Regions:
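Active-site environment of divalent metal-dependent phosphoester hydrolases
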Residues: 13-15, 41-42, 75-80, 102-105, ...
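Conserved beta-strand hairpin/beta-sheet module of binuclear metal-dependent hydrolase folds
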Residues: 1-65, 200-224
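Acidic/histidine-rich helix-loop elements
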Residues: 37-50, 178-185, 190-193, 248, ...
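Flexible, acidic/histidine-containing loops and adjacent segments that form or flank the divalent-metal
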Residues: 1-4, 80-218, 292, 297-299, ...
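Divalent metal-coordination and catalytic microenvironments
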Residues: 10, 19, 36, 74, ...
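Active-site-proximal beta-strand/loop segments in catalytic clefts of secreted hydrolases
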Residues: 22, 35-38, 73-75, 98, ...
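Active-site metal-binding motif and surrounding structural segment of the metallo-beta-lactamase
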Residues: 22-33, 40-97, 233-248, 261-266
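Long, structured stretches of catalytic cores involved in phosphate-ester chemistry, encompassing
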Residues: 106, 230-305
Length: 330
């Protein structure tokens, strides 16, 4: 494998990205990383007409034997719960996230039955799965690493990940807000804190920029427009941009598109365009910026005809060249 591969698995409304890069020091000569894992809800995969499938099914069908690195960009059900299911089959050697490595040890399982709406239920399950994912990683001999803006981490020969967010202040705020939630004993106040943390979680996302020779890939998790403050414009420049927050109206604007100036944009919106993902205005401004648009699923929009597929694979050269291909099956 002379080039890097970045595959966006069709997990419906969610995100799951498989990164593969040549590394002679690894078994099989390939470094593998899974960035988020989509949802673990069975209902997400009842209709598979667009090609969607749980990430662990995709990985198994690909014949993968291990995952060197897993990245949890933030604790929302459509990102972390599928990651846990993948970790049950492929316990990672390393897990990246934002909280201190041992932070999960001070947390306890939360009662999902107290939820008063679907959003609270999803978030409670995500928080519980965060604890389980950390515990599973460590019990299988893996390590947990906390990342903050300013770090650059080598991944394999020629490839590194630069952390653009969260800032030290935001990472500390996430830690404090999480601690306050778990310490709350009043039921009403607990639910208020739960919803507040849920609402803030997107902009606690890890924002990663993968640097591979001249190619730069910007992966902002669910960050919306309010989450890029403090990041220098030149740091956002990228040839491939996974638009934040599933391409909803707050996922990008012209100012952000002008800073990134991508040749290609990937939108991780579901075929049913839940929560108004793949918003037409967002897609229009990204296309107007000169970018080619690609989708992890098949959102139904006028003049958009994305074929059913299990995944979208980019082959990326060190010179910044991109080759995209929809894979009909794993």
């Amino acid at each position: 494998m002379e080039k890097m591969k970045l595959t966006f698995v069709n997990v419906g409304y969610g995100e799951a990205m498989l990164l593969e890069c040549a590394d002679a020091s690894r078994p099989g000569g390939v470094f593998t990383a899974l960035i988020d894992g989509g949802s673990a809800e069975a209902s997400e995969f009842e209709d598979r007409s667009s090609g969607r499938l749980p990430v662990q099914e995709y990985l198994s069908a690909r014949g993968l034997e291990r995952i060197d690195l897993m990245v949890s960009t933030h604790t929302h059900e459509d990102h972390i719960c599928g990651l846990l299911e993948a970790a049950r089959l492929f316990p990672p050697a390393e897990l990246w996230q934002t909280l201190p490595p041992d932070y999960y040890r001070g947390l306890h399982p939360l009662d999902v039955s107290v939820a008063q709406n679907p959003s609270q239920s999803k978030f409670l399950r995500a928080l519980n799965d965060y604890i389980t994912l950390c515990s599973l990683t460590v019990s299988n001999g893996g390590t947990i690493r906390a990342l903050q803006a300013g770090e650059t981490v080598p991944l394999c020969p020629g490839l590194s990940a630069k952390v653009l967010a969260p800032s030290q202040a935001d990472a500390a705020a996430l830690e404090q807000q999480t601690a306050a939630l778990y310490a709350e004993t009043d039921p009403a106040a607990f639910l208020q804190k739960l919803s507040a943390l849920d609402a803030r979680m997107n902009n606690y996302s890890l924002i990663l920029r993968l640097d591979y020779g001249e190619a730069r890939i910007l992966l902002p998790g669910d960050t919306n427009l309010a989450g890029y403050g403090g990041i220098a414009d030149e740091e956002l420049r990228a040839v491939l941009f996974k638009v934040g927050h599933h391409g909803q109206i707050d996922g990008a604007d012209k100012a952000l598109a002008d800073k990134v100036r991508p040749a290609a944009v990937v939108c991780c919106a579901s075929s049913d365009r839940r929560y108004n993902s793949a918003h037409p205005d967002t897609l229009h401004l990204l296309k107007e910026s000169g970018a080619e648009l690609y989708f992890s699923d098949c959102p139904c929009l006028p003049e958009l005809h994305t074929p059913p597929h299990a995944a979208l694979m980019f082959t990326i050269g060190r010179n910044g060249a991109l080759d995209a291909c929809y894979l009909p099956e794993a």
